Amino acid sequence: MSSVNLTSLGANQLKNTTTGEMVEIGSLWREQAVVLFFLRRFGCQVCRWMAAEVSKLEKDLKAHGIALVGIGPEETGVKEFKDGGFFKGDIYIDEMKQCYKDLGFKRYNAINVVPAAMGKKVREIASKASAEGIQGNFSGDLLQSGGMLIVAKGGEKVLLHFIQKSPADNPPLEEITKALGISANVQAGEKPQCNEDVCTR
């Protein structure tokens, strides 16, 4: 059972990257179930690949009345991210990073971020992203981790609370659809074999 307090979390403010309007995160699940994808940062190559992966579900989510929303911890890189078309849902910014804190998405430090970013799984996904033409950069907050939160309509309950243990962690697409009780006709991207020459972007 998730320990997330949706009442207190729901009062946190997010900035809509299209309108600039500030909204409570709770408004995103008031009228519909929602998949909230929390990115580490918008310039992260691995995050962009993950965004493209979860976006494969957008059509099926929409057909079931479920919203797909991306949330980043800062403005840096958001225009390039949106222009790149990596993500098919609405995008918000948690400027205070309060949602990240409340959901237990950890912050790395200067010592542990390097081994985390150079891990085999990170390099494998970076290699896959490069093969698919997805590039990245090192702009912005390199220390924040992310995850995912899926909330039932009306904030009835948390359906999935996923916390990254490493920068390459992401819930499989089938885990997302299972949590929502829907089926989707999509093919998940294959995890590539590690290439020692590739490092995370």
UniProtKB/Swiss-Prot annotation:
> What SUPFAM superfamilies does the database record attribute to this sequence?
Thioredoxin-like
Q: Keywords in alphabetical order, please.
A: Cytoplasm, Fatty acid biosynthesis, Fatty acid metabolism, Lipid biosynthesis, Lipid metabolism, NADP, Oxidoreductase, Prostaglandin biosynthesis, Prostaglandin metabolism
Catalysed reaction(s) here are:
prostaglandin H2 + [thioredoxin]-dithiol = prostaglandin F2alpha + [thioredoxin]-disulfide; prostamide F2alpha + [thioredoxin]-disulfide = prostamide H2 + [thioredoxin]-dithiol
Which biological process terms from the Gene Ontology are attached to this UniProt entry? Answer: prostaglandin biosynthetic process
Compartments where located: Cytoplasm, Cytosol
- EC numbers on record: 1.11.1.20
Kind of enzyme, top EC level?
oxidoreductase
One GO CC annotation? cytosol
Does Signal count among this protein's keywords? no
Q: Which InterPro entries does the entry link to?
A: PXL2A/B/C (IPR032801), Thioredoxin-like_sf (IPR036249)
User: Care to name a GO molecular-function term for this sequence?
Assistant: prostaglandin F synthase activity
Family statement drawn from the similarity comment of this UniProt entry: Belongs to the peroxiredoxin-like PRXL2 family. Prostamide/prostaglandin F synthase subfamily.
Biological function: Catalyzes the reduction of prostaglandin-ethanolamide H(2) (prostamide H(2)) to prostamide F(2alpha) with NADPH as proton donor. Also able to reduce prostaglandin H(2) to prostaglandin F(2alpha).
Q: What is this protein called?
A: Prostamide/prostaglandin F synthase
Give the encoding gene's name: prxl2b
